[in-house]
Amino acid sequence: MPLSRALILGVLALTTMLSPCGGQDDIEADHVGSYGITVYQYHESKGQYTHEFDGDERFYVDLDKKETIWRIPEFGQLISFDPQGALRNIAIIKHNLEILMKRSNSTPAVNEVPEATVFSKSPVLLGQPNTLICFVDNIFPPVINITWLRNSKPLTEGVYETSFLINSDYSFHKMAYLTFIPSNDDIYDCKVEHWSLDEPVLRHWEPEIPAPMSELTETVVCALGLSVGLVGIVVGTIFIIQGLRSVAPSRHPGPL
């Protein structure tokens, strides 16, 4: 695996409403916003700055392009965010991280094993466009590679990933998306690479389409249906005849 365990990762989260005073169970809210989640990876000189609402990403700041990227483009038409604020936070966290590394004698972060699940966005119909979702949870440190494979070959088109989204225990989760057209000829895998894994983990997915009935099965079903129908007709006729017979003796001739 190309990621070295010896590399140091620094993580500091500058958040709002993630750690309420008195504990998380003391405050109940209908909605929770997490603002300014900042992650800095010292070994690669990269970072991440995101805003979340109810666990969903609102936007992140592309630190290389120095611009705000909205999860849903229409959000950017209603509100705005100056990316310079994110750049200032990254500079502060980098400075603080250097101090913490010296105090901790450059102790590496503890690696947690991520958990991955693959599922489709909508019920699968062959030939109908759909989306595969690879949900990866319990990520720490937040350094991970997620790759989509079709028939064991990497895919680069139609793929999208969220940024790292924070959990209540300060681990992270991430979702990778793949737009595709289901086919019986294709199988898909979500490949996950992380420092905690000795080798990549593959999560397999292929369409589960009910097999069509054979001609023999169709014939048997039709014969059974016809037999049940005939039995119903015969039984119904018998009941009608018995009913008529039981009514006939009860009729008495009237006076002449």
UniProtKB/Swiss-Prot annotation:
The chain crosses the membrane at residues 219-244. It holds the Pfam family C1-set. It is a single-pass type I membrane protein. Residues 245-256 are cytoplasmic. One of its GO terms (molecular function) is MHC class II protein complex binding. Residues 1-23 form the signal peptide. Disulfide bonds join 134-190. SMART domains: IGc1 (SM00407), MHC_II_alpha (SM00920). Residues 112-205 are annotated as: Alpha-2. Belongs to the MHC class II family. This is Rano class II histocompatibility antigen, B alpha chain. The lineage of its organism: Eukaryota, Metazoa, Chordata, Craniata, Vertebrata.
